[in-house]
Curated annotation (Swiss-Prot):
Encoding gene, per UniProt annotation: TAS2R41
Membrane topology, record value: Multi-pass membrane protein
CDD domains (alphabetical): 7tm_TAS2R41-like (cd15018)
Other known facts: Most taste cells may be activated by a limited number of bitter compounds; individual taste cells can discriminate among bitter stimuli.
Main location: membrane
Residues listed as glycosylation sites in the UniProt record: N167
Family statement drawn from the similarity comment of this UniProt entry: Belongs to the G-protein coupled receptor T2R family.
Key word ATP-binding present: no
Species annotation: Pan troglodytes (Chimpanzee)
Entry protein name: Taste receptor type 2 member 41
Length: 307
């Protein structure tokens, strides 16, 4: 029975990963084609293509890691493959967190109806900062990755020089990750999460007040403008829930509370990668350009299937 449940959750994780890879790859291909065609991208498209690319790679790396680790537990735990994975995973995950934060800030300054002078100044200046913020996010993520590598490297150096046993290396490495990394990761990931939370809550509150004002002025729930604001609210709330779930799951995952040997490992991995697999579809259906191309592909697929 336990083996059947494990196989079920592994299959579910595989399907979720394939959907996430396909959706993020779709975003990158569509916006990349536009970039090649026109030689430039709008600030929103810059963030979307960066977010799609980082999520695509993160989902791919995570999927390969999980299945390779499940097949080669002993060799992988004590070898350099684990270090190689963590380098890529920390870099991509940090970049993804920052890109999500800048996406929420851009949504906030473009949509929120706030008349404070500082916000109006930010509304005017922020779109021009987007390329530099994205570049800075990549640089920060690279520095953070080097920091994790610098902290974790001695265990692998001792393994190579003194030829420690696999078990001792694994225990040493696990001790470092259990007692040092969680607090460090909490501090590092809390910065983009705080930026995201402030901007998304400001935007949700602004849209909520605007929707209530429209209803108070006689607009019905069936009014197109009211429906548009309601859809935007639902999309933002979904983004907030998925991002918060991703943040909490990554913090818990950093404590190594659920190991590969745990019965809940595969359900937990589904929770960890849920945001980067599901949120791309929310972005596709809420973006006119992406939704249009996606609808065309569905029509082509339907015509091919009927033929």
């Amino acid at each position: 029975m336990q083996a059947a449940l494990t196989a079920f959750f592994m299959l579910l994780f595989s399907l979720l990963s394939l959907l996430g890879i396909a959706a993020n790859g779709f975003i990158v291909l569509v916006l990349g084609r536009e970039w090649l065609r026109y030689g430039r991208l709008l600030p929103l498209d810059m963030i979307l293509i960066s977010l799609g690319a980082s999520r695509f790679c993160l989902q791919l790396v995570g999927t390969v890691h999980n299945f390779y680790y499940s097949a080669q537990k002993v060799e992988y735990s004590g070898g350099l493959g684990r270090q190689f994975f963590h380098l890529h995973w920390h870099f991509l995950n940090s970049a993804t967190f920052w890109f999500c934060s800048w996406l929420s800030v851009l949504f906030c300054v473009k949509i929120a109806n706030i008349t404070h002078p500082t916000f109006l100044w930010l509304k005017w200046r922020f779109p021009g900062w987007v390329p530099w913020l994205l570049l800075g996010s990549v640089l920060i993520s690279f520095i953070i990755t080097l920091l994790f590598f610098w902290v974790n490297y001695p265990a692998y150096q001792e393994f190579l020089i003194r030829k420690f046993s696999v078990n001792m290396t694994y225990k040493w490495n696990t001790r470092i990750e259990t007692y040092y990394f969680p607090s460090l990761k909490l501090v590092i990931w809390s910065i983009p999460f705080s930026v995201f939370l402030v901007s998304i809550m400001l935007l949700i509150n602004s849209l909520r007040r605007h929707t209530q004002r429209m209803q108070h002025n006689g607009h019905s729930l069936q009014d197109p403008s009211t429906q548009a604001h309601t859809r935007a609210l639902k999309s933002l709330i979904s983004f907030l829930i998925l991002y918060a779930l991703s943040f909490l799951s990554l913090i818990i995952d950093a404590t190594k509370f659920i190991s590969m040997q745990n019965d809940f490992y595969w359900p937990w991995q589904i929770a960890v990668y849920l945001c980067i697999s599901v949120h791309p579809f929310i972005l596709i259906f809420s973006n006119l350009k992406l939704r249009s191309v996606f609808s065309q592909l569905l029509l082509l697929a339907r015509g091919f299937w009927v033929a």
